[in-house]
Amino acid sequence: ADTIVAVELDSYPNTDIGDPNYPHIGIDIKSIRSKSTARWNMQTGKVGTVHISYNSVAKRLSAVVSYSGSSSTTVSYDVDLNNVLPEWVRVGLSATTGLYKETNTILSWSFTSKLKTNSIADENSLHFSFHKFSQNPKDLILQGDAFTDSDGNLELTKVSNSGDPQGNSVGRALFYAPVHIWEKSAVVASFDATFTFLIKSPDREPADGITFFIANTDTSIPSGSGGRLLGLFPDAN
């Protein structure tokens, strides 16, 4: 199975797999059962911003979700990613819909990772930034139902021609280049990711959510990972 670390924006509570009974953001380490969660006052139809950060000195993974003009939600978890992830990974965004549905639209996405070793010259870094997405993106690996639209947005799950979200959809987008996320001799390994998103839904209860995830380089959508499993995990263990 894939090795996954993720930050989830979970719009639909699945209490049977340990979700709190409200929309929440969470940190997932190798399982959909989040290690840490915080209540998320999701605002459908409004653009939100997610900022995720980690560094190997503090060994803390943190995420902040905010909408302009309202307070932000923060979640963090202490973890040494050297012990969890392979040295080389890919980073991506995933989303699903199920019986209930929502648009899982990504408007922008940026990422920076840095590895500093003791030698002065040796800093390994990777940076990318999408302010809009091209129609036939060469620098993204699109999986499942994910596609880029004519407005320059990345739609992670299916929408109709008129823009209505479709149910039972799963999609992911990964940056094409592998990321060197840690190294034994590194003094500091760190990364920052930011994305803006828009969730809209005709349903009273939108579902299921969006994630930022880090995985082994050959990661693919696991069979049966739709709905509550957010396109990341084959089961709810």
From Swiss-Prot:
Database matches in SUPFAM superfamilies: Concanavalin A-like lectins/glucanases
Keywords on record: Calcium, Hemagglutinin, Lectin, Manganese, Mannose-binding, Metal-binding, Vacuole
Classification via Pfam families: Lectin_legB
GO cellular component: aleurone grain; vacuole
Temperature effects on activity: Hemagglutinating activity stable up to 60 degrees Celsius but diminishes with higher temperatures and is absent at 100 degrees Celsius.
PTM summary: The beta and gamma chains are produced by partial proteolytic processing of the lectin alpha chain by an asparaginyl endopeptidase.
Major subcellular site: other
Gene3D superfamilies: 2.60.120.200
Binding site for Mn(2+): E8, D10, D19, H24
GO MF annotations in UniProt: calcium ion binding; D-glucose binding; D-mannose binding; manganese ion binding
InterPro entries registered for this protein in UniProt: ConA-like_dom_sf (IPR013320), Lectin_LegA_CS (IPR000985), Lectin_legB_Mn/Ca_BS (IPR019825), Legume_lectin_dom (IPR001220), Leguminous_Lectin (IPR050258)
Residues that hold Ca(2+) according to the record: D10, Y12, N14, D19, D208
Subcellular location: Vacuole, Aleurone grain
UniProt-annotated binding residues for a carbohydrate: Y12, L99, Y100, R228
Extra remark: Binds one manganese (or another transition metal) ion and one calcium ion. The metal ions are essential for the saccharide-binding and cell-agglutinating activities.
Protein task: D-mannose/D-glucose-binding lectin with hemagglutinating activity towards rabbit and human erythrocytes. In rats, elicits an acute inflammatory response by inducing neutrophil migration and induces dose-dependent paw edema.
Family: Belongs to the leguminous lectin family.
Subunit structure: Homotetramer.
Full protein name: Lectin alpha chain
